[in-house]
A protein has these predicted regions:
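Membrane-proximal basic amphipathic "stem/tether" segments
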Residues: 1-60
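A conserved helix-loop-beta module that forms one wall/lid of the active-site cleft
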Residues: 43-122, 138-147
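C-terminal active-site "lid" helix and adjoining low-complexity regulatory extension at the edge
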Residues: 45, 247-285
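Short, flexible loop/turn elements at secondary-structure junctions
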Residues: 92, 113, 162, 175-177, ...
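Generic beta-strand structural signal
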Residues: 102, 175-176, 247
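A long amphipathic alpha-helix within ATP-dependent nucleotide-binding catalytic cores
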Residues: 151-155, 195-254
């Protein structure tokens, strides 16, 4: 059986030396493969992300600091207040800690040093210790050479299921020069992932990114103005960044801060969506 391109890519990642030259080579090949074009110096969505990833900006100490899902809460507390943080129940530093720990019957369990990994525990269901053990053995840098993850310490954070829900809507707000510019809404992430995009006045936009455009309506949050203020305050410490929020219409909680959305390889549907999104984000100061 011939190995897949994905398998060959992972082998190449393991074999290439871990340095910035090879990191940038991987970024270039990944960008070329995803977008079928060379990266440019233009203010286009993925090109700006590519430049963040391939320059010293991705290693800015603050960007590295907020990549850790435990430490980002210290930043959020300092900038917008601890009331915007999801409460922390526990932080576990080893599998020994995990095996000794009595997990709450309902909780959210996730690694602080990875992305896209989460276990939602309900009604005291058994916790998958093998999956958590894999987290401790994983380094997200080795997946796609995002250098801000390279030296993060493996940990697991335990949080409550906020708003008593395991199917929250993610509001991802793209900020540029300290202002909220574009809103991405992720729905049914753990069922049938789909997305919608809105401007800051909650007008729906005619494109999606990576996932299908959601068909079901998404109501404007009652506290949208507060959400935009929180995102802008946090985003003011970066050039271009994504601030992820959860809300029940009253409270506004920060999920994470993302430096390089989609590793700069997610594609728009239709293709013209990238120019529209880019003009909304970068086209005005």
């Amino acid at each position: 059986m011939k190995p897949s391109l994905k398998t060959l890519y992972r082998i190449a990642l393991r074999l290439l030396p871990e340095n910035r030259v090879c990191d940038n080579l991987v970024a270039f090949i990944t960008f070329l493969r995803a977008h079928r074009r060379f990266p440019t110096d233009e203010l286009l969505f993925n090109d700006v992300l590519y430049r963040i990833k391939t320059t010293g900006e991705i290693l800015d100490p603050l960007r590295v600091f907020v990549s850790d899902k435990e430490f980002v809460k210290l930043f959020v507390k300092a900038v917008v207040g601890d009331e915007c943080n999801v409460p922390t129940i526990a932080v576990l530093y080893s599998m020994e800690d995990v095996r000794r720990y009595q997990f709450p019957s309902d909780c959210c369990i996730k690694p602080t040093h990875l992305t896209g990994k989460v276990v939602l525990r309900r009604q005291s269901k058994p916790v998958d210790l093998e999956e958590i053990d894999d987290w401790f053995k994983s380094n997200h840098y080795h997946v796609n050479r995002e250098a801000n993850y390279k030296n993060l310490r493996p940990k697991v954070i335990v949080e409550p299921l906020i708003f008593n829900s395991d199917s929250l809507i993610d509001y991802k707000i793209f900020c540029y020069k300290g202002r909220a510019r574009l809103i991405q809404v992720d729905v049914d992430r753990h069922i049938e992932h789909a997305r919608k995009f809105f401007d800051i006045n909650w007008n729906e936009l005619p494109f999606s990114l990576l996932y299908p455009r959601a068909t079901r309506p998404v109501e404007r949050p009652r506290n949208l103005d507060k959400m935009l203020t929180v995102a802008s305050s946090l985003g003011s410490h970066f050039g271009f960044v994504r601030v992820d929020l959860y809300t029940n219409g009253e409270e506004c909680l920060v999920g994470e801060i993302t430096n390089c959305h989609g590793n700069a390889w997610e594609t728009f549907t239709p293709d013209s969506g990238e120019e529209l999104a880019s003009s909304m984000i970068f086209g005005r100061d």
